[in-house]
Amino acid sequence: MSADSFNLENSLTYKLHSLAKLIDRHADYTDLEPVRISSAEGRVLAVIGFNKVLSVVQVAKKANLDKSQGSRAVVSLVDKGLIEKRQQKQDARAFDLSLTEKGKQVYEEVVALIMHRNDIAMKTLSAEEQQNLLNLVNKIQHNLENN
């Protein structure tokens, strides 16, 4: 394919990036009660809630944040009383993160928002199309992670 025949808007990576940005715009966690959290904080809360206990490095990786973004989100969530840090026994420099009781309540709201957002995104797809889409996205992710 030459540059003359290239169509940026039909490029898979361009489409996926645009879709990710559109999803982020729909990820409004600011109305959550009893606290307001950012999109990054919402992802961190969801990752910890789903996995139960993780290190800061694991959280950043699973939430697709760089280490500094992950650390800022963790500090903010600790300050808001939504997650707690416990020093790891095997490494005094490392901490395990888990949800507090208040964090578990907010996590339930975050999950409800994620499910609602997924329902909106997939509403015109049949169950078979939804499964096919997820399978294809998983294959693409595998290709990129292993290349």
Explain the meaning of each model-derived region.
Residues 1-5, 128-147:
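C-terminal regulatory/oligomerization modules of transcriptional regulators
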Residues 1-35, 82:
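N-terminal leader segment of winged-helix/HTH proteins
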Residues 24, 30, 75-138:
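Charged, amphipathic alpha-helical coiled-coil/dimerization segments
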Residues 51-55:
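Short capping segments at the starts of secondary-structure elements
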Residues 60:
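The alpha-helix within a helix-turn-helix
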